[in-house]
């Protein structure tokens, strides 16, 4: 049976497309919506817990609380994504599919010309609506350089869509584990995590703290200069000023990132986000995922395997991402490892606040004890019988490595399956230097203020 959004009382006025055919019903009743209770004084922000049976118009709501949020029709979003074409498909998460589009002033007055990402939430089950609502309420009111910008939304009949700014470099997960474009240099990793930490700090410092609850690499989006922004606020929730009083019966999030006290007792606080941050920091150091089920039992859970080695300088080097090839600040690695150790404490009160995390990460960007010398990019070239070294303008060496013996040594008629496998071209491996990225992206790569 198909689930209908109309079965749910909506907290935000949902628009009806004026181009749709009129129904046979005459004088349809005006839609009443669940919204904020009317109060004698206007609150500084709308909270999920503030909704009651009182009603308020969309205009009153949006003008009072939303910041530069546009309301789109479904047809408008269908047009800008070329009918949600597979050629515009960016990816799919737990809450829906994402498509690329482009908006400008001709679509909506005052709309900035920009590429956008349109997320169409799945309609199966009631939880999807709550997630859509959380994103509209939180991102519609809170603006920060390290939170993804919500351009607008669509709430039309059964459709629930969100329109975000488009982030050119995708998410951290792809760069860290798939190594798109090569392994991320050390300083770039620090910059990304510092930006994400500033985003969490901003959420936690609200009058009523916002608990993100789903901090992980796939939710950290990257701009062209590797500035990071938090996205996907579907699981975010309002915290309490009394941290010890936050308990929930439903544990939500992603395996491997949730804090132990949240899993075992449902105790959800800002310190739960700090634990998740520690997991991602550990992933950044090791380039290993939080949970890798293909490994032996002892090494499947990254925190259990790596945390004991974070405070031992002799063991720490063993777990550092080998693709960094030693091109990192030794002091910076140790400081980051010590911070991860604190964030991953089983005692929530022993974890640092996100303000402390930010203050710890900022000086690491200025450490200069990084090994000199460029990274090496190995390019396999079939048929080359010797190794050539080429000096490039940006001091990045390019090496052509022999991958195939001369045909005279291995005649074709003797090249059986074994030999073909033996001389199969190597997969290329690219690691770009901080120096090269600095030249191409500018000083913003190292600017802690970003």
UniProtKB/Swiss-Prot annotation:
Membrane-spanning parts: none
Binding site for ATP: 90-98, 119
MF (Gene Ontology): ATP binding; protein serine kinase activity; protein serine/threonine kinase activity
Residue span, Protein kinase domain: 84-365
EC category: transferase
The protein's name: Putative receptor-like protein kinase At1g72540
Superkingdom classification of source: Eukaryota
Pfam families: Pkinase
InterPro entries registered for this protein in UniProt: Kinase-like_dom_sf (IPR011009), Plant_Ser_Thr_Prot_Kinase (IPR050823), Prot_kinase_dom (IPR000719), Protein_kinase_ATP_BS (IPR017441), Ser/Thr_kinase_AS (IPR008271)
KW ATP-binding (keyword) present: yes
Location of Phosphothreonine modifications: 73, 254
Catalytic function, reaction form: L-seryl-[protein] + ATP = O-phospho-L-seryl-[protein] + ADP + H(+); L-threonyl-[protein] + ATP = O-phospho-L-threonyl-[protein] + ADP + H(+)
UniProt entry keywords in alphabetical sequence: ATP-binding, Kinase, Nucleotide-binding, Phosphoprotein, Serine/threonine-protein kinase, Transferase
Keyword RNA-binding carried by entry: no
Active site, per annotation: 214
Modified residues (Phosphoserine): 218
Organism name: Arabidopsis thaliana
Family membership noted in the UniProt record: Belongs to the protein kinase superfamily. Ser/Thr protein kinase family.
Residues with Phosphotyrosine modification: 164, 262
Enzyme Commission numbers on file: 2.7.11.1
